[in-house]
Curated annotation (Swiss-Prot):
Belongs to the MnmG family. The keyword Ribonucleoprotein does not apply. GO terms for biological process: tRNA methylation; tRNA wobble uridine modification. This is tRNA uridine 5-carboxymethylaminomethyl modification enzyme MnmG. FAD binds at G13, G14, G15, H16, A17, G18, V125, S180, Q370. It comes from Escherichia coli O157:H7. NAD(+) binds at residues 273-287.
């Protein structure tokens, strides 16, 4: 039977991609349905209890700048907050927080249940309703059919998921959850390229069986960072430390002598694992010269005794896992409460997607999260938000939107996936962005909140706070530009005491702030330049904008040059065999990828600058050279 009411957008899956997709579509005023196999696991952290990190924290801030949920949820659930790369430049600084799993899940569910235009329904989805290459709905396990103008697939590792512990394996979406086999089979019938990937998780340890007294502690930062531009540290729950132990030669001997029982090394697992989050058996074999590896013991929550040993993800048999755990300092008597495992699952080639994350072959069908070959909660959340907002725009007969590489890490993520595809689980790093000086955590709102407002994602409260911040930045910069001190002035001695070279000519507040030894905090304690802004976010922007002004201007010039290529559109139906002068390799790659622009074509491996020149000349001759606004 059909459900009596139609929807604008259906989201299938309630993980980190699905929850952001559902919230985005509903915020934009579309009637949205979130279908999940279990309402109690909405926003579940399936692997490590943490949000953020290098590159990942940038994505969380961007999701927040567009009105998303993840940053707000972690501010309410984070039990240890740190700034990574704090001693380096602002472009690569990143926020990371340990999470209380239960508090995080509660924060996500509360937000979903209180979001207007959003209905949550518990049923596994087994089929899609596709008519004339357009998706028009979904069918659940009990045969109930829902109609919609757009469908977003955010099914994580559940598609034909297979869990491996040693040489034993069984079907599962993650430990304790069933896989989605009928939906996987249905998707394989569609004209989509499919592959297999693998990820893993470590065993969980009972904290009461660990001797923490012999281990080094790792505390969070003070003052505590916050993730959301709307957040503050008073929202954070109680803060707790993590602990550090190490593997040793005994650990490595145990692993080496049991490799024949590893599904990875025995050839049982076909899927490729994540390069930047390798299993402990991979680390021992790939880095044979290392006699130890650092392991972080991370609490899973304030009311849980479970400890997540970050760094020993494994699919070795349970008896070997016990030996590995007990070989490490402080863990000699440790007890495992959940075994580690590897999970293998279907993913779909993201090169078959438009930059909006809509399928090139099935109209109205969007893909987001691990189904696109990514790894990580943050990468999933960012894709979910993008897919959700574009599903909402499609259902409202509006053009899709995707950020450029120069606008957001989300733009880098989507362009990498849709242009290059991936053969291993894709993780975001700052090194993937060529314009990272512009794409900082601290300015995510300055880059994206105005766009979010135009798209209908940003509410009045966030918009008012954003405009107040902009005014504070502008007013303070004008104040510092127009406040001067001369070498002969009474205040010069006070200023000189903080400079490596004394004033030799008249200087404004901005001139002084450009000096490497001067900070905004120090400057605003000096008589001519006091008082400091009470708006800490605006104060941070003033300092960064002044200190890095020259570098930022240079990068802006580079972006404007590249924008010409990004805006030169390529016809979706163009058969590149018509273009004389292109090599067979280039023709094959362009026909395979079907890039949307010259910029995208130039990033395809094997497409040379000479080929781009030939293509531009041919387009001009044919009268097909078009540029977007």
């Amino acid at each position: 039977m059909f459900y009596p009411d139609p929807f604008d957008v259906i989201i299938i899956g309630g993980g980190h991609a699905g929850t952001e997709a559902a919230m985005a579509a509903a915020r934009m005023g579309q009637q949205t349905l979130l279908l999940t196999h279990n309402i109690d696991t909405l926003g579940q952290m399936s692997c490590n209890p943490a949000i953020g990190g290098i590159g990942k924290g940038h994505l969380v801030k961007e999701v927040d700048a567009l009105g998303g949920l993840m940053a707000k949820a972690i501010d309410q659930a984070g039990i240890q907050f740190r700034i990574l790369n704090a001693s380096k430049g602002p472009a690569v600084r990143a926020t990371r927080a340990q999470a209380d799993r239960v508090l995080y899940r509660q924060a996500v569910r509360t937000a979903l249940e209180n979001q207007p235009n959003l209905m949550i329904f518990q049923q596994a989805v087994e089929d899609l309703i596709v008519e004339n290459d357009r998706v028009v709905g979904a069918v659940t396990q009990m045969g109930l059919k829902f109609r919609a103008k757009a469908v977003v697939l955010t099914v994580g590792t559940f598609l034909d998921g297979k869990i491996h512990i040693g040489l034993d394996n069984y079907s599962g979406g993650r430990a304790g959850d069933p896989p989605s086999i009928p939906l996987s089979r249905r998707l394989r019938e569609l004209p989509l390229r499919v592959g297999r990937l693998k990820t893993g998780t470590p065993p969980r340890i009972d904290a009461r069986t660990i001797d923490f007294s012999v281990l080094a502690q790792q505390h969070g930062d003070n003052p505590m960072p916050v993730f959301s531009f709307m957040g503050n540290a008073s929202q954070h729950p109680q803060q707790v430390p993590c602990y550090i132990t190490h593997t040793n030669e005994k650990t490595h001997d145990v692993i080496r002598s049991n490799l024949d029982r590893s599904p990875m090394y025995a050839g049982v697992i076909e899927g490729v694992g994540p390069r930047y989050c390798p299993s402990i058996e991979d680390k021992v074999m790939r880095f044979a010269d290392r006699n130890q590896h650092q392991i972080f013991l991370e609490p899973e929550g304030l009311t849980s005794n479970e400890i997540y040993p970050n760094g020993i993800s494994t699919s070795l048999p349970f008896d070997v896992q016990m030996q590995i755990v007990r070989s490490m300092q402080g863990m000699e008597n440790a007890k495992i409460v959940r075994p580690g495992y590897a999970i293998e699952y279907d993913f779909f080639d993201p090169r078959d997607l438009k930059p909006t994350l809509e399928s090139k072959f099935i109209q109205g069908l969007f893909f987001a999260g691990q189904i696109n070959g990514t790894t990580g909660y943050e990468e999933a959340a960012a894709q979910g938000l993008l897919a959700g907002l574009n599903a909402a725009r499609l259902s409202d007969d509006k053009e899709g939107w995707a950020p450029a590489r120069s606008q957001a890490y989300l733009g880098v993520l989507v362009d990498d996936l849709c242009t290059l595809g991936t053969k291993e689980p894709y993780r975001m790093f700052t090194s993937r962005a060529e314009y990272r000086l512009m794409l900082r955590e601290d300015n995510a709102d300055l880059r994206l909140t105005e766009i979010g407002r135009e798209l209908g994602l940003v509410d009045d409260e966030r918009w008012a706070r954003f405009n107040e911040k902009l005014e504070n930045i502008e007013r303070e910069r004008q104040r510092l530009k127009s406040t001067w001190v001369t070498p002969s002035a009474e205040a010069a001695a006070e200023v000189n005491a903080h400079l490596t070279a004394p004033l030799s000519r008249e200087a404004s507040g901005e001139d002084l702030l450009r000096r490497p030894e001067m900070t905004y905090e120090k400057l605003t304690t000096l008589t001519p330049f006091a008082p400091a802004l009470t708006d800490e976010q605006a104060a941070e922007q003033v300092e960064i904008q002044v200190k890095y002004e020259g570098y930022i201007a240079r990068q802006q010039d580079e972006i404007e040059k590249q924008l010409r290529n990004e805006n030169t559109l390529l016809p979706a139906t163009l058969d590149y065999r018509q273009v004389s002068g292109l090599s067979n390799e280039v023709i094959a790659k362009l026909n395979d990828h079907k890039p949307a622009s010259i910029g995208q074509a130039s990033r395809i491996s094997g497409v040379t600058p000479a080929a781009i020149s030939i293509l531009l000349v041919w387009l001009k001759k044919q009268g097909m050279l078009r540029r977007s606004a």
